[in-house]
């Protein structure tokens, strides 16, 4: 009987060691998988859901998440779409745990400049929030030109076409200063 008890005890200890080893491996694999998840993947997990976005500038945007790209996201508000570069965001409210990677290589390659070029091509009237240490500054106008890391915004009279006689001035804005770019929904993003 003593031998049976000894072998049963040893068997229980080995089973417990195997269980602990398996739990440790599962924990390690979970941590390794989490390291590979990008913020844009988490955002894609809540596409179509309501999301609150608090910007570093102090401004807040709340609406339906319409797109999560490589460098920016798009929020649908009632009348506007808001393009927000990821570096302008301080925090998100309503972001779930689900993550979805972008399967399209082409979509993964599309960055902020591509979205801004589409707005420039459409001559969309925009309200651009610039973030900084002094708070939010707004520019109203049309994008004239998009460079590698900057955008030229022509201030135009609201409702007027972008013609030289309607342009007040042209501001060159580094991408790093962009906090939010609002366009009317019908203009498309």
Each language-model region and where it sits:
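Short glycine-rich, low-complexity segments
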Residues: 1-62, 66-189
